[in-house]
């Protein structure tokens, strides 16, 4: 198989994640779906197998060559894995998942779905999630109907769903004018790579409707509320100096360059929480955050960021160097990028 096979085609940018692990960068996001009833693993596994027929470009695994990682078709059966919520851990792409670069798990009334960032982004993976959940509900006997929002079994796969969105930027140049030149950010060395101590997970839940209604009442977006609140907490814990907390924010490029692709198609922008925000009312901080985002999310700036990052990652992936050296170089590129800012949202 070659990368000309549309089922094996992936994007220019996210190949960088093939050369990283959980020890170098967060590359396996988790989606948590809370159900009304206890999850039925047999019906869930059946749903995953059905969804793979609709999303055949998700039937991937990765294998090393002397100079790079490459994708190949995965013909193994799909699996769903029991979670205990505490100690059981699985490795995506290993025998745990039969080599698949995504994971589906369950615990009591909760379904967990994770993916390796080299094959998708959050917006793209949501399409696969919707199909799995829709099929699961059907398999359980619920009278669900597709209102057109699900790429279900009543629709056909298109090669554009595995398109490399960044190819739309080829042979084009964009200006970096107006991109905020960030200063040194606040960091938290005690929770970075190599720090002693176990992983800390904190979960905060609330109705999205309440967040949406509040944000609308003061004329901002939900992100303009959530992001500064998280940065304020980070500043309270690790800041207190004249340095800003800076969060990395992923931006979906599909509204700018429409595509059906479920592959990785984002760029990142930097969002600060300035020291002077400490003395301002929250509403004012939220409004200033909205204004900053509006200024930094101009089309030209976003496409410049996207092309620069994708070109750099593609060049490294295609470089003729031993795999061990390429892994080391890719991990340095990734960790240097992440450590420029305080944390990633």
Residue ranges and their predicted role:
Residues 36-52, 114-130, 200-239:
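Acyl activation and transfer enzymes in specialized metabolism, enriched
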Residues 72-77, 115-119:
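Secondary-structure transition/turn motif
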Residues 2-14, 110, 119-127, 131-213:
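Non-catalytic, low-complexity flexible loops and terminal extensions
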Residues 105-109:
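Elongated alpha-helical scaffolds
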Residues 30, 119-134, 212-224, 301-323:
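Short flexible/disordered coil segments
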Residues 1-68, 76-103, 236-345:
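Acyl-thioester-dependent acyl-group transfer interface
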Residues 132, 136-140, 234, 293, ...:
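Short, well-ordered alpha-helical segments in soluble proteins
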């Amino acid at each position: 198989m070659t990368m000309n096979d549309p089922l094996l085609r992936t994007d220019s940018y996210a190949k960088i994640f093939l050369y990283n692990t959980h020890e170098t960068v967060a590359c396996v996001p988790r989606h948590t779906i809370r159900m009304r009833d206890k999850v039925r693993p047999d019906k869930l596994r059946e749903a995953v197998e059905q969804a793979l027929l609709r999303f055949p470009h998700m039937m991937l695994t990765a294998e090393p060559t002397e100079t790079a990682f490459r994708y190949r078709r995965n013909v193994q059966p799909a699996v769903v894995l029991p979670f205990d919520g505490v100690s059981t851990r699985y490795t995506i792409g290993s025998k745990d998942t039969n080599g698949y670069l995504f994971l589906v798990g369950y615990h009591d009334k909760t379904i967990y779905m994770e993916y390796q960032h080299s094959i998708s982004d959050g917006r793209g993976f949501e399409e696969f999630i919707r199909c799995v959940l829709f099929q699961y509900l059907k398999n359980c006997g619920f009278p669900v109907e597709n209102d057109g929002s699900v790429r279900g079994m009543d629709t056909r796969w298109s090669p554009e769903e595995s398109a490399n969105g960044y190819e739309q930027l080829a042979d084009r140049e964009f200006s970096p004018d107006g991109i905020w030149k960030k200063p040194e950010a606040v960091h938290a060395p005690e929770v970075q790579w190599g720090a002693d101590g176990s992983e800390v997970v904190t979960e905060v839940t609330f109705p999205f409707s309440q967040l949406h209604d509040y944000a609308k009442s003061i004329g901002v977006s939900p992100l303009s509320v959530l992001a500064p609140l998280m940065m304020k907490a980070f500043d309270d814990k690790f800041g207190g100096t004249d340095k800003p907390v800076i969060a990395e924010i992923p931006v979906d490029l599909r509204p700018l360059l429409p595509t059906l692709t479920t592959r990785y198609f984002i760029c990142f922008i930097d969002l600060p929480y300035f020291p002077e925000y400490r003395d301002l009312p929250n509403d004012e901080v939220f409004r200033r955050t909205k204004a900053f985002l509006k200024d930094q999310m101009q089309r030209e700036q976003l496409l410049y960021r996207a092309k620069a990052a994708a070109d750099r990652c593609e060049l490294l992936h295609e470089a003729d160097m031993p795999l061990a050296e390429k892994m080391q170089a890719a991990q340095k590129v990734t960790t240097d990028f992440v450590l420029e800012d305080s944390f990633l949202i």
